[in-house]
């Protein structure tokens, strides 16, 4: 099998951690490295969390590189209220002692693009590292095969303001630079589709019943997330945004959308808003495939069966039994 080569650029983060799990459990993908950006938590904490997840999966062979830690212009705002003080739902998993992250996320991205053909980036945090790569070496950054990003909103309302999704809101200038300068079609896996990906109480109860170490870890790190979603949105369960970007990259039939020109608001009350030019007001060539529809059941089947293949039969039974109301 010819594996798809990727770098995961992320800010772990509960759902980032679930996305890393899915990527590493998918034989179609070859994860060349994980680069860390500040977002859900500061980059240093995010790097420590990435190592914790890699250790749990027995994949400390994958290098972790940390970015500069600050957005291009705006002061950093993190989301410990959503992800817990440690970024992993206040589980306080033990620090990894036998491995460490390295500095130089931007250089790692650029060197990897110079050395590897057909390398894609899946960016599930703020776009600071990608923007700084463009600042440093635009020609090399444009060599990436695809940029799949979790961020933005089109028809959906925002999750940190009425109109802005968190990743673009944290570093709107970085997002603006990427959309305007990358010169590659971007795929925007935004809130229009990710809001439909909910780890429901039924799924969580199923995971508990498996008595499986990885299932137990998922339950453990999402408990805080579940409480947050109930308190803030009256959602039962938790929305897991980031794994959908991985799933779509593996199987694009899971989502559908349309190409548009997209720009990002960098100031004012709408800061971080993704402006999707549905009416062709700007008369510019599309720079982004904006996903608007998702087969949530197909996603959940992929996500759960890949992470827990030994429980595939039970997972299929739950997914296909309407009485569970998933």
What are these regions (language model features)?
Residues 2-3, 22-23, 30-31, 169-173, ...:
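Conformational coupling and interaction surfaces
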Residues 64, 178, 246:
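A residue-level signal for conserved active-site and pocket-lining positions in enzyme catalytic cores
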Residues 41-45, 72-73, 153-157, 263-280:
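Short, mixed-charge aromatic SLiMs
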Residues 2-10, 14-52, 92-195, 201:
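Active-site histidine-anchored catalytic micro-motif
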Residues 4, 47-115, 287-299, 304-308, ...:
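Metal-dependent C-N hydrolase catalytic cores
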Residues 77-84, 161-165, 203-205:
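Short, surface-exposed amphipathic charged segments that create phosphate/polyanion-binding patches used
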């Amino acid at each position: 099998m010819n594996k798809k080569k990727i770098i995961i650029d992320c800010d772990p983060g509960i759902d980032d951690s679930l996305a890393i799990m899915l990527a590493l459990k998918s034989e179609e993908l070859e994860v060349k490295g994980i680069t860390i950006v500040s977002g859900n938590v500061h980059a240093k904490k995010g790097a420590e969390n990435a190592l914790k997840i890699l250790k749990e999966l027995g994949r400390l062979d994958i290098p972790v590189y940390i970015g500069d830690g600050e957005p291009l212009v705006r002061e950093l705002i993190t989301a410990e209220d959503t992800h817990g003080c440690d970024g992993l739902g206040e589980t306080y998993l033990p620090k990894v002692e036998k491995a460490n992250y390295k500095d130089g996320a931007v250089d790692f991205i650029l060197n990897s693009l110079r050395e590897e053909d057909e390398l894609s980036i899946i960016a599930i945090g703020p776009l600071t590292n990608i923007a700084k790569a463009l600042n440093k070496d635009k020609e090399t950054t444009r060599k990436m095969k695809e940029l799949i990003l979790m961020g933005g909103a089109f028809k959906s309302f925002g999750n940190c303001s009425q109109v802005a999704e968190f990743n673009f809101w944290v570093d709107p200038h970085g997002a603006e630079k990427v959309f305007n300068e990358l010169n590659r079609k971007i795929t925007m896996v935004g809130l229009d589709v990710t809001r439909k990906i909910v780890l429901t109480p039924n799924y969580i109860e199923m995971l508990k019943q498996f008595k499986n170490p990885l299932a137990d870890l998922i339950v453990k790190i999402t408990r805080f997330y579940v409480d947050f979603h109930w308190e803030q949105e009256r959602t039962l369960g938790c929305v897991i945004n980031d794994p959908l970007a991985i799933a779509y990259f593996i199987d694009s039939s899971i989502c559908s959308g349309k190409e548009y020109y997209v720009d990002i608001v960098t100031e004012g009350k709408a800061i971080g808003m993704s402006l999707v030019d549905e009416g062709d007001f700007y008369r510019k060539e599309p720079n982004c495939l904006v996903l608007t529809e998702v087969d949530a059941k197909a996603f959940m089947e992929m996500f759960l069966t890949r992470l827990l293949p030994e429980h595939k039969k039970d997972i299929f039974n739950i997914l296909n039994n309407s009485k569970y109301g998933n």
